[in-house]
Amino acid sequence: MRILLIAVLFLLMPKSNAEIPGCDFFDTVDISKAPRFSNGSYLYEGLLIPAHLTAEYDYKLLADDSKEKVASHVRGCACHLRPCIRFCCPQYQKMQKSKCYGDMSEDELNKHDPFVNVTLSDGSVVRRHFKEDLIVQSDLAKPGCPRMYFLNHELPGNEFTLFENGSLLRHWDKVELSKREYCVQHLSFKDDSIRIAPHFCPLSSEHSRTWKTVAIVISLICIILTISVYLYVEKLRNLHGKCFICYLASLFLGYFFLVLNVWKYSSGFCVTAGFLGYFSVMAAFFWLSVIGIHLRIKFSLASNCLHRLLPENPFRAYNLYAWGIPLIMTAITYTADQVVKNEKLRPRVGVGKNCWIYTGDMTVMIYFYGPMLLLIAFNIIMFVLSAIYIYNIKKNVKGLVHKQQTNQQINDQQMFAIFLRLFILMGLSWSFEILSFLLTKQQAWARALMVADYFNWSQGTIIFVLFILKPSILKLIIAGGRQNLPGSHHNSRSKAARYNSTHTACEGSIADPNAYC
């Protein structure tokens, strides 16, 4: 309730400075010195920018989406009206060894080639003068690296395509760079020519992206294999197993949309993919909480009273909870994205060519990381309560040799161990993800938390190893999915007697589907 109240108060607060709705900072230019008309419009480089595409800014956005405080100035969304070209330095300066030098001499201007090829949205290629036909952006922050590489399109393997929307495609590795990731500048070449050449950071980020993709794809394959085993092995298709499958399905969808975003394959339906990815990740957390809730219920009550707390069809109730609440959260996030006027409080799904919820500032804590932290805290409570129960049971039955009590203790411990594994796996990995977000501007911490990122991307692989590559599960797979798990060799008469004594069906657990109720 407090978080909701704080969010409402934030929405009601007046904006400290306006931003242009629907316009990325990297699509704007500084128009402070341009003539202003009485209707609020500006005339910039022969382009009339209407009042609704202008706003006052008191910051400069850096390549990593962090903000640097600067003097208040007016910016216009010129790139929505005419194609822009993003320069590294002032427009008439040259660049050598990643540094900007003074303006070109008259002789250099005479031999300089001022034209660039621009690919339009219909696929046609036109030749444009950088100054006369395009809007020059020269006040944006350079890509965040001390040394940049450049492309000489006259050399084999150095071809590139500059698109009308400002993005640049490197042909040799098919990577499309946004205006945050590259800039162009006049450059002297060995043949004594001066041409406009794109500059970009070393490819470590691309290598990281490749390894990220490898880790996620392997996880996706392992999730499919894990789901297949749980569907194939009859003994695993109990209530816990079904909840586990739903958890894996939502985790699969979350990773699927994440890898699409990494390689920009979802750009055609960017906003839709962002909301679907958001829903999937939230659903995975709620299904993890379902497992914790159900185990807590089993630990809290005697088995003959279990049916009094659970609804007649608990799996249906769990589905309503674990899919329904994330759906409501997604609807709220979508509504906020449409109606909230303060740009700093909008989720901004799909902003900056990133087909995910915007993570460039603390707003993500309201819509994404905040709910995630609450669910992690809830699961910690479930874990502590279950641990206390296990401890008390172990203490109470110490010295007893009654077989059913001993087996009950073993089964409870097995179920708790499963929940503990899942909690540590997902809770810890996403906790590191949130920590990584909070410390993203501190390079030393960012490097240290890189291993946590790979741990997060490899969740599906770890689940497969922990839950499938076990002797008991492998034995069931080899036996055709019908053999009882080890430790379940009780005759049918004793099982029937136990069933009648408890008056309720035994759901079993992920670890041991034949566990006592």
From Swiss-Prot:
It is found in: Cell membrane. Residues 19-212, 264-272, 341-363, 436-459 are extracellular. GO terms for cellular component: membrane; plasma membrane. It holds the Pfam family Methuselah_N. Glycans are attached at residues 39, 117, 165, 456. The chain crosses the membrane at residues 213-233, 243-263, 273-293, 320-340, 364-384, 415-435, 460-480. It is a multi-pass membrane protein. GO terms for molecular function: G protein-coupled peptide receptor activity; G protein-coupled receptor activity. Keywords: Cell membrane, Disulfide bond, G-protein coupled receptor, Glycoprotein, Membrane, Receptor, Signal, Transducer, Transmembrane, Transmembrane helix. One of its GO terms (biological process) is G protein-coupled receptor signaling pathway. Gene3D superfamilies: 2.30.160.11, Methuselah ectodomain, domain 2, Rhodopsin 7-helix transmembrane proteins. Residues 234-242, 294-319, 385-414, 481-517 are cytoplasmic. The keyword Glycoprotein applies. Disulfide bonds join 23-77, 79-84, 88-183, 89-100, 145-201. Residues 1-18 form the signal peptide. The keyword Disulfide bond applies. InterPro entries: GPCR_2-like_7TM, GPCR_2_secretin-like, Methusela_ecto_dom_1, Methusela_ecto_dom_2, Methuselah_N_dom, Methuselah_N_sf, Mth_GPCR. CDD domains: 7tmB3_Methuselah-like (cd15039), Mth_Ecto (cd00251). Belongs to the G-protein coupled receptor 2 family. Mth subfamily. This is Probable G-protein coupled receptor Mth-like 4.
